[in-house]
Amino acid sequence: VNTHQLQVWGISATVGNLDEAKAVLMSPLKEDGVIVKANMDKAIEVESIFPDEIEKYPWAGHLGIKLADKVLPIIEKSRTTLIFINTRGMSERWYQTLLDINPDLAGSIALHHGSVDMELRNWVEENLHTGNLKAVVCTASLDLGVDFRPVETVIQVGSPKGVARFLQRAGRSGHRPGAKSR
């Protein structure tokens, strides 16, 4: 006789309506369920970086690439930095531009997106976990469900495709109790 019952868990840092989420998760079981919510404040530090000269369209042509030299000091100050770019093509361009500006970064920065070979993506993720990378230029491939404790800073180039995505990306840094997300 099996006395074990199915348990359903829903875990999220960004779900807005917890009661609605609980109803969706629990409806197949016809049970009420319990909401457990951490009552912790999360410190978030946001810094905007702008070009020295504001042109008509400061990011025209190549999204923010002219600000790559302003990103380098941020990378240098942090243990590990994730640089989120919205498209694969621009992530490759940013990765190469950072290497062109500072060739000494070779071997300490990496690229991660869905078209990168799975073996290389796994290598990047492992080296993020162990703190062996200074920075990773990435797309949404590192948005969700990842916990890389060495990450101290997240840079978002351009606008993310929504507030929830921005919060997910910001939450990749300082991903431990009491740590500040930057």
PLM segments and residue spans:
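Helicase motor core with emphasis on the C-terminal RecA-like subdomain
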Residues: 1-182
